[in-house]
A protein has these predicted regions:
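Conserved small/polar residues in nucleotide/adenosyl-binding loops
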Residues: 1-3
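Short helical patches
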Residues: 6-11, 38, 42
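Long amphipathic alpha-helical segments
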Residues: 8-9, 16-25
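Flexible, non-catalytic peripheral segments of proteins
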Residues: 26-32
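Extended, compositionally biased flexible segments
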Residues: 33-125, 134
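Conserved positions in beta-strands of structured domains
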Residues: 93, 163-166
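Cytosolic, membrane-proximal regulatory domains of ion/volume homeostasis and mechanosensation machinery
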Residues: 102-137, 141-151, 157, 165-206
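Phosphate/adenylate-binding glycine loop and adjacent helical scaffold
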Residues: 160
């Protein structure tokens, strides 16, 4: 890891992560013009924030900007049943086949080259997670990473119904490429929610 990457990892991860996340969440909801303007100025300084696609151009708080809606007609979902659209904006970090069979502990995916993790650990490592790991062995996965400036709402990727949500408590590690190549099983350590979707033909998606 070069000096620049080491510094990036230090500044984004070797801090009181959970406390900082809670503070930023509190700060972002303050509805004072000077707080909003200062926060957005700093945000634009360190990112490529583009609000040209946003439905609204003025926001009461930083949080309102972060969860902004898009103008109507943007991000259309492909209606073909054999196509699954991306549920969000994002950069593809990894994709491929879910490897392993036979035992839930053997079913693996990759967060980065050379950094595998067990699917059961991602799903919560309970009885439901073990059953799902076996069900999805041999299936496909894709990892999407949202940068801070991207549109941050999520949408159902195809015609389906939400059957269950599993919440898994955890840390708040940054998921940038530097961290993914430095922290093993990072996704399994972070706070997360597993959404169980089922298509009309019975196919299950996570």
């Amino acid at each position: 890891m070069c000096i620049r990457d080491s510094l990036n990892f230090l500044l984004t991860n070797r801090v009181p992560r959970i406390a900082l996340t809670h503070f930023v969440g509190w700060w972002s909801r303050i509805r004072l013009p000077w707080v909003r303007d200062l926060s957005m100025a700093i945000w634009k300084l360190f990112s490529d924030l583009d609000l040209s696609e946003a439905r609204e151009q003025r926001f009461a708080s930083l949080h309102d900007c972060f969860i902004r809606e898009l103008k109507p007609g943007l991000r259309p979902v492909d209606p073909r049943p054999e196509v699954i659209s991306s549920p969000s904006d994002g950069i593809v970090g990894a994709c491929g086949r879910i490897s392993g069979s036979g035992e839930p502990q053997e079913v693996q995916v990759f967060q980065a080259k050379g950094f595998p993790y067990r699917l059961v650990d991602l799903l919560g490592n309970d009885a439901r997670g073990h059953a799902l790991a076996l069900e999805f062995a041999g299936g496909s996965y894709v990892t999407l990473r949202l940068t801070s400036s991207m549109y941050h709402r999520f949408h159902v990727p195809c015609e389906s119904r939400l059957e269950h949500v599993t919440y898994v408590s955890g840390d708040t590690w940054n998921v940038n490429p530097i961290a993914l190549k430095s922290v093993e099983r990072l996704f399994c350590k972070n706070e997360r929610a597993v959404l169980h979707l089922r298509q009309h033909d019975g196919t299950r998606l996570l």
